[in-house]
């Protein structure tokens, strides 16, 4: 009975997250990653500056028109806005569902040079219970798969999807929707076909493992990479080629009963990420059995971060850019994005 109740809660949460053409905002950068981005923008790397930046995001007027849920980091969910409101409560007030990143990062996999395994399962049941009391209704765990001459190995793929499945089981037990993120990195000189082959292998291995762990596929969200050539590849593919390869790979690998796919941007420029998502939804609308949306971080945040620069006087302009960027991605989810939207900034 309790399992059935949880299943309904999970379905309802997913429905709300993606209602009215919305997507997800990933603002779950670890302290190290956030500091790196601050350093590049010339912003002091302090806990207070990180708090101010996160407040800038969660208090952006009208953000809930395009964003149904925001993924927080442990530091963020414990922080308050200037008026003393917890960040998660500020999101709820803005009409956005709070989520939480629960993995503790990818570490070098012993015995497998250049490959990583994501950690964070120890004590996860207790952490999920705490995050739930703090308002989190969904969670995220990211696995990292690297393409190189001799990678990925089947050992690293299996280890990572095993961890993703254990995480998903603990989330569903807690009534929290798991975002399952197996990211095949864009880094490298590989072709789009190589990315396709690796992504297909990863997804098929993942869903077999999720099946073995009795994961309720209707109560999860898949956050995959798009099928795209490596950043150093000699061949650059067209927007339509990326859309076609991505859709074909997903149709081959992802069960139709999964309710939603929310793409990661993976370091693509904001414009490219939107154009690819748009082509997927526009060109293949009649063939997609899932909601196909976004869960972008840099592809939404970067323009705002570049303008903010840590200055109070730039907050309104930065929020305007954040709002516009999210609007563009929501349009791409509907297959209605065009580059002219970028000029309206």
Question: What are the residue ranges of the model-derived segments?
Answer:
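Catalytic core of soluble alpha/beta enzymes
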Residues: 186, 190-257
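Short, histidine-centered active-site or binding-site loop motifs used for metal coordination
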Residues: 104, 145, 184, 226-228
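Alpha/beta catalytic barrel-like cores
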Residues: 2-134, 147, 235, 239, ...
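Proline-centered loop/turn at the N-terminus of a beta-strand
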Residues: 97, 177, 219-221, 260
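Helix-rich catalytic cores of soluble enzyme domains
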Residues: 124-212
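Residues that line or immediately flank small-molecule/substrate-binding pockets and catalytic motifs
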Residues: 74, 143, 224
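Conserved, mostly hydrophobic/aromatic
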Residues: 46, 141, 180, 222, ...
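Hydrophobic residues within beta-strands of alpha/beta enzymes
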Residues: 70, 139, 178-179, 220, ...
């Amino acid at each position: 009975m309790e399992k059935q109740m949880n299943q309904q809660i999970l379905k309802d949460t997913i429905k709300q997250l993606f209602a009215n053409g919305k997507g997800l905002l990933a603002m779950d950068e670890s302290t190290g990653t956030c500091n790196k981005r601050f350093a590049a923008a010339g912003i002091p790397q302090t806990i207070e500056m990180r708090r101010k930046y996160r407040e800038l995001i969660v208090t952006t007027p009208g953000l809930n028109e395009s964003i149904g849920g925001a993924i927080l980091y442990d530091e963020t969910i414990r922080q308050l806005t200037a008026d003393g409101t917890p960040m998660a409560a500020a999101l709820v007030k803005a009409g956005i569902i709070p989520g939480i990143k629960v993995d503790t990062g990818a570490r070098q996999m012993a015995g497998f040079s250049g490959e990583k395994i994501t950690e964070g399962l120890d004590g996860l049941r207790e952490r999920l219970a705490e995050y739930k009391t703090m308002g989190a209704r969904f969670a995220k765990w990211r696995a990292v798969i690297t393409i190189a001459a001799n990678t990925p190995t089947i050992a690293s793929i299996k280890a990572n999807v095993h961890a993703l499945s254990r995480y998903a089981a603990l989330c569903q037990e807690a009534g929290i929707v798991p975002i399952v993120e197996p990211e095949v990195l864009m880094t490298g000189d590989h072709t789009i076909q190589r990315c396709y082959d690796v992504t297909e292998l990863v997804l098929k291995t993942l869903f077999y493992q999720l099946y073995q762990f009795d994961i309720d596929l209707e109560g999860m969200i898949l956050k995959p990479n798009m099928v795209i050539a490596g950043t150093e590849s000699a061949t650059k593919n067209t927007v339509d080629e990326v859309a076609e390869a991505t859709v074909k790979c997903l149709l081959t690998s992802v069960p139709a009963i999964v309710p939603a796919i929310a793409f990661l941007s993976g370091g693509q420029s904001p414009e490219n990420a939107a154009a690819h998502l748009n082509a997927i939804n526009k060109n293949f609308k009649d063939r997609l059995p899932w909601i196909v949306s976004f869960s972008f971080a840099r592809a939404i945040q970067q323009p705002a971060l570049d303008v903010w620069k840590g200055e109070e006087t730039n907050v309104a302009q930065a929020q305007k850019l954040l709002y516009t960027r999210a609007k563009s991605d929501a349009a791409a989810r509907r297959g209605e994005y065009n580059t002219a939207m970028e000029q309206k900034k």
